[in-house]
């Protein structure tokens, strides 16, 4: 069986990501057109509307997407399709889009199973019924944990007591119908209750039909046909069965009655339905569908307005705050062009009705600043002068070129996007403020849809098909990041599987189908939705996994479709690091700075940046960025803006990086075809590096602001299979009409297409560059405080605590070395702290850098509560001995062992062996007989150097002793393996043999299978480039080594040093049990 045969019939998205939903629908519509032949007799078939259908948002139940379901319904000639996911509207917006694309009417509904077993579907009839359905779902979801719901009859009755229901109820009788269930539903919904007859050829359908019709007549309840649809087509049954097995955590072979007996729960052709149901029941479904007139797109949303004080309108209050912010930002008066820009923006904001949204974001930022929480806006909102005046963003509009259309325009039919970063350790305070301010009834986080990826899908599928755990692990590894461009067939074969095995083929085929299939809802990283009325009237709300969090059932794409505004409160670790560093500098060094008041354009800082001495700083710490820095040689702030943006897939794939560097280095002349283009591209030497520049170029050519924004969207869509050809034709015509040469037009368009692979807006890059400069200045001038703050902000960033400490201790020609003291129970707090040194007095008298005392937070297995007890007891009086420590700090066995293994007791008892012995005999209480003689101390020999280093890494994650490679250096010399110092003395192009600890593996999407590896020895980091053919040949050594040896060619060009690997092999055996952290494929 071939690979293509195995996945025949399995829908696959285009490579590189999912297409926009509308295009996905269109593609599947075309596929369905090929699948179903429309005959002239179609009009004579019975009409039908499917009123009970689950999509893939009935997680692990429905096998098909809304797009697939509507495409199928369209070609079967259905008049309507109800999406009735179980106690959920999570997939309903996708249903709306699919309905628009196909013309098949969408009916909004949901399926429920009550605690007593009663099953029914609610369908929305009108605008009154929609909030009723949302409220029922919310009640059920809020009464249970994440991913579950709980509803009883009392809760349902309470929602419809004393109100006219705006919904219809379809009773779903079981195999043994209980008339009392139907009677109860009829009491609640009266004539709006119906009996759904669902026939699936699983038993005697004729007998069941007769029994259900008699039951309906007995109850005085109308009956209609429905399908309990769980898949678009019959061939999807294997996927539905697999999802059932995953849901029940059973192998398929053990699922038994959990599986459907056949594939009848698909959208069946009307001819088949006409042979199964009486035409009257089919017609009843159509008639009920016609009564469901609710249009989801007409849902009204009102933003909260309580922030507006009495006597003000939202517009007048926003203007007042903006003008006050202008006076604060520009004490001497704002420039005339800024005033004009702000007036223009306020007029546009009022026209779009977004004043309350801006006021909300400003209020959240105001709260954070009042609490001392660092925050900063980013993204396209940094194009707004109003956002700058309000203190939301940090990019001064008088110092940069703004393009408001990138953020908001009159023609743009979608909400503005304002992203604000907060310290990652304190963002929860901000989220809880929003909940408190607006109430949990009116505020909730947006959802994120967690979808299957290759690795997670194959794990679940293989388990469902009964593969043993060891084989599942092998198969899952075939989908790992490190496989590069190795064909899947080769990966499978190398893992020891036979592609001719039908079981393996079936697992792989189902896995392919489940790629991007929704698995569950999670919470968005920080997107808040706030409403003037209870959110549960607008969209169902459910509990998140985290305590004190609630989420709505729609994700950010749904919100955009429904034109709902969200406030993005995001978490950024570097803000935590900078705030902690500034606190340390203020408290220990006597320098009171904020990000805004740090000395600007500091030559020493830029000199450090040019040497790529940027471990731990913001954004420019990655391998690719560090390789760019010596070539670009930033000398001013705008260079940092370019640096942030240039190492992105868009500029790389658009072939903008090398031309820019050649022009910057003087190897290529800079020219412009017109003054208009020079005005747009002058600062980037004629090369478009930012999204705003692309939009400005086409506006210059004749596009409107709205058309330019549509081009931006098309650029992103092009990467996922969209069509850029209409834009190519129009841009060519417009620019040719302005006299531009065809070569220039083609070059510009190719660069435009490159932005489809992700390019930064300049506003976003400028916002990030502020933090780049701040972190670099602190690293250069306050290296101890910066390293300490960085350690205290972990986990974050690219580098482990070990690498941060190694870098601080090593120093550089541009930066002082920092002394680091070990963890010590007599001196360490929870956090790492600064000790010693002398305060800063002036640039002429900068004082002396302090040392860092490692904190007890670095100790594996030691909780913060235990450390709080240790510090509190130590503050009362010094510890007399180990027994006193254990007694007064109430240390349990786990804490005692953690302290001993970490070497945190050496100042009390000597070496690590002595500490282990002492802790082994201690209890956290005094002896029963106070006069009992103390046990005689035993003198134990100190561990060997290698044992100490191994224990350090195991217990603390780092070592202040010799670097492991220093211990191994004699063996390296025997093998003629060089260290970094010897390597740096070699000429460009030399053949070399090196080895080091693996600290990073990266495979950028633009690298065509090339893997970049960072090795570390006692002198620093070695950057290794592994071409795809070698990565495939030496995959195991490349991906599994802790200590990797490389033979290759040493290269040094424009200050950038790296090793081109010719061969590599694993030396991890030399490390013994030592486990070292490596940051792989992030």
Curated annotation (Swiss-Prot):
Keywords: Cytoplasm, DNA damage, DNA repair, DNA replication, DNA-directed DNA polymerase, Nucleotidyltransferase, Transferase. It comes from the Bacteria. InterPro entries: DNA_pol3_alpha_NTPase_dom (IPR011708), DNA_pol3_finger (IPR040982), DnaE2 (IPR023073), DnaE2/DnaE/PolC (IPR004805), DNAPol_HHH (IPR029460), NA-bd_OB_tRNA (IPR004365), PHP_dom (IPR004013), Pol/His_phosphatase_N (IPR003141). The keyword DNA damage applies. It is found in: Cytoplasm. Its main location: cytoplasm. DNA polymerase involved in damage-induced mutagenesis and translesion synthesis (TLS). It is not the major replicative DNA polymerase. Belongs to the DNA polymerase type-C family. DnaE2 subfamily. This is Error-prone DNA polymerase. It comes from Xanthomonas campestris pv. campestris (strain ATCC 33913 / DSM 3586 / NCPPB 528 / LMG 568 / P 25). The lineage of its organism: Bacteria, Pseudomonadati, Pseudomonadota, Gammaproteobacteria, Lysobacterales.
